[in-house]
Amino acid sequence: TFNEEILKELNRYFDKEYFDKVYAEAREMNFVINMDLIIGLPNESTEDILRTLDTVKNYDIENLTIHVLALKKGSNLYREGHIHEEIDYEKIEEKITSITETKGLKPYYMYRQKNSLEWGENIGYSVEGKESIFNIQIIEESQSTFGLGGGAITKFTNGAFDEEIELERIVNPKEPLAYIKEMRDRFDKKVKLFKK
């Protein structure tokens, strides 16, 4: 969202002026720009979402990913039984369609998550030829990832497409003291896993 009040409530502090500066620098360096938006944030109305989508129109982007809020079991929102605002999915869908068509963005991947709002699907849109291969590989679990930091997940996969994918996971503790205590052991396990 570009709604600074909602971001503050979520402890996500945002400075649009700084964002625009970094965006302009990335544009100058010919980076492929992706924006990810989450629909269904606490206290976000249909009008808030539509305003955010109107703001997105002002940026020259190659990728847009629309996520629907999924409540993770360990999150405060899940524990507190968060109930999302009633939002007009039809209006939002119309706006997304208008923006993606205007910008020449076409859907190239979709997935669902547990505990997501009724709309439920996450869709990645892209200009042709600028699709994020990383996103596709992560969703397909055909890409190994090395997770660093509290709560990060390392996934090691054989990357097989024509056979059963083998996947091993190592999850870092979220709690800081447990993370620090177990950091060396988990790091060694990850290195061993990637040396296979």
List the model feature ranges, each with a label:
Residues E5-E9, S98, A178-K181, D185:
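Charged/polar, solvent-exposed surface patches and flexible loops
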Residues M29, M35, Y108-M110, M183:
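Detector for methionine-enriched segments
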Residues A70, G74, Y78-L148:
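A C-terminal junction/extension of Radical SAM enzymes
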Residues K16-V22, N43-D48, N76-E85, Y111-G120, ...:
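Short secondary-structure transition/capping segments
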Residues T1-K95:
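Conserved non-cysteine loop/helix-boundary elements of the Radical SAM core domain that shape
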Residues G124-K196:
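Radical SAM enzyme core and accessory elements
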